[in-house]
A protein has these predicted regions:
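Glycine-rich, anion-gripping cofactor-binding loops and their flanking helix/strand elements
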Residues: 64, 214-294, 394-426, 440-441, ...
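Phosphate/pyrophosphate-binding active-site segments
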Residues: 2-3, 139, 175-177, 200, ...
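Glycine-rich, acidic loop regions that bind phosphate or pyrophosphate groups
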Residues: 100-143, 237-339
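Active-site diphosphate/adenylate-binding microenvironment
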Residues: 8-19, 26-29, 34-41, 341-419, ...
């Protein structure tokens, strides 16, 4: 007779097969059978987040680097707390497995008041995930887990939730039900005729524009070949670094700059690779993109979603761009005059941003000088993150400047923790504001406990700075509800056992950041913006909001 193991043990063993390095979660009576199995086997690290939102965000960050993030939450309120972070993982296209509990099978959907019960949990998980499954039969647990992981890792990737009733987690199943991992679905290879047609269009263009999004994160080599040949490249903020900012053909992410928009208008062909052309990067879709326009996307439903396309090629960006790059022969587009115009446009955009940032441009430069070349900037949705953090801070490669794509505040700290655990040999800077940090402040304890290699940079302006800017611009300067009482973050960090610095003069940026970033492990730098000066920002350029 086959050896019997619990479903919790089967889950732990299955995750090991996928080389899962860490599980992020909050321990609960509704996930203890899984937690116990993971703990006994001692092969997967468990990171005890202080809230479910933080745990899923940490797993999201980890999954962006490793190819699979794993989070574990409790039933009901615990699963509900995870929804915002699942929405972010959906926007980022992160391969993520979210394991959560359910009431005992006999009481499912009975509305009896069973502890942690919530009405129709599976429905809100479906709404916030790529897919959501319920395990109703212990013998199907491993099969459903394999299917969920395959779904999460199949482009377009996204979070997949699996709810498991507590009694099924502890139920015994035969060890023989453990099966090998499912292979990832193969990339959609482009048909030769499609490549031929696209190459003909590209070759005919005098000055093509390549717009890169997160779907092209693995296309760096092909993109560089095309850029070397003279294709002008611009990226979404998620696509930063696919082509290094230092490349002569890179417009970086300056799509909202007048000088860059003027240059774009001189192009005569647009190739969009793996980008949704989001509202905040196209002035709410009023930015004129050159025609003809061709789009590469793995998702057929993305065709002409935000801009009318002349053609949409359903294919893997890496495969199709590589096929184009193979046909390149030396420099084929542009010339020295175009290079000069492009350089001038980028320099004008950067100078305009530096002027807007004022003294804080020095902070950007101080971090750039002190952070190792392979260091990673993780930024919350904050004024500093949206200004100098988003576009002024250079990206040398993909996933070196990451953020919340859904635009929700509060994810910077847990995202930095997950990034650091996924990249233990690299230094991470977590750029947050005092307002956003308050939403996940408890994760400061997680940072300390896990000794993550993060320097948390807290831009403290005593409230919601972006709301002040929006109220100034759209509401006649009337200021309501944007002031926040916040702690002395330096003392709070020290109370957590963290090394911490406080900066109230721009002249000290270089010295403090050099010292902080040279120290391994977690630390905190609080920048007191009230003494240095405010940053004014009313959101990205777009049509009138109100």
């Amino acid at each position: 007779m086959s050896e019997m193991i619990t479903v919790g043990d089967a889950i732990a063993r299955t995750l090991e097969q996928y080389h899962v390095e860490a599980i992020y979660g909050v321990i609960s009576i509704h996930n203890l059978p899984i937690a116990d199995a993971v703990g006994q086997r001692e092969k997967i690290r468990f990171v005890p987040a202080r809230g479910e939102a933080g745990s899923v965000t940490m797993a999201d960050a980890h999954g962006r680097f490793s190819g699979l993030g794993v989070a574990r939450t409790s039933t009901g309120a615990g699963a509900g707390n995870a929804v915002g972070a699942l929405v972010e993982a959906m926007n980022a296209g992160t391969p993520l497995l979210h394991l959560t509990g359910q009431v005992e099978k006999a009481w499912l959907d009975a509305d009896t008041g069973f502890i942690h019960e919530t009405r129709d949990q599976l429905t809100f998980l479906k709404a916030s995930s790529k897919r959501a499954y319920r395990i109703s039969n212990a013998n199907q647990a491993v099969a459903i887990l394999h299917k969920a992981i395959q779904e999460a890792q199949t482009p377009p990737c996204g979070p997949v939730s699996v709810e498991i009733p507590i009694d099924i987690q502890s139920a015994k199943i035969p060890l023989s039900l453990l099966t090998a991992p499912l292979k990832r679905a193969p990339a959609v290879e482009p048909e030769a005729s499609l490549v031929d047609a696209l190459w003909a269009q590209l070759k005919q263009a005098k000055q093509p524009l390549l717009w890169l999004g997160g779907g092209a994160l693995e296309s760096g080599e092909a993109v560089k070949t095309l850029a070397d040949a003279g294709v002008t490249v611009i990226s979404s903020t998620h696509g930063r670094g696919i082509l290094a900012d230092s490349h002569r053909a890179s417009l970086r992410a300056f799509h909202n700059s007048p000088s860059v928009e003027a240059l774009i208008s001189q192009c005569d062909f647009t190739l969009v690779a793996g980008s949704r052309l989001r509202s905040n990067e196209t002035r709410s879709w009023t930015l004129e993109l050159p025609t003809p326009r061709v789009q590469i996307d793995i998702d057929p439903a993305a065709a002409s979603r935000n801009y009318l396309m002349d053609n949409t090629l359903v294919a893997d960006c890496r495969a199709l761009l590589a096929a184009l790059a193979e046909r390149v022969q030396g420099r084929m587009w542009g010339d020295a005059r175009w290079d000069s115009q492009l350089k001038a446009a980028v320099e004008a955009a950067e100078q305009g941003l530096r002027d807007q940032c004022g003294a804080y441009a020095k902070l950007n430069d101080a971090i750039a000088q002190a952070l190792p070349d392979d260091g990673i900037l993780v930024r919350d949705i904050t004024v500093s993150g949206s200004l100098w953090g988003s576009r002024l801070f250079r990206a040398h490669g993909p996933l070196m400047n990451i953020h919340s794509l859904a635009g929700a505040i509060g994810m910077g700290l847990p995202m930095a923790v997950g990034t650091a655990i996924a990249n233990p040999q690299r230094k991470v800077v977590g750029l947050v504001g005092d307002g956003g940090l308050s939403l996940n402040l408890g994760e400061l304890a997680t940072l300390a406990q896990e000794k993550a290699n993060v320097t948390l940079l807290i831009m403290n302006d005593g409230g919601y700075g972006v709301m002040r800017g929006i109220q100034d611009k759209y509401f006649g300067g009337r200021q309501y509800y944007n002031e926040l009482h916040t702690p002395d973050f330096t003392l709070l960090a020290q109370a957590m056992g963290l090394q911490a610095w406080s900066v109230d003069r721009a002249e000290d940026f270089q010295a403090v950041m050099t010292e902080a970033l040279a120290m391994p492990g977690p630390s905190v730098v609080e920048v007191k913006m009230g003494q240095i000066g405010a940053l004014r920002f009313a959101g990205p350029p777009q049509k009138t909001l109100y």
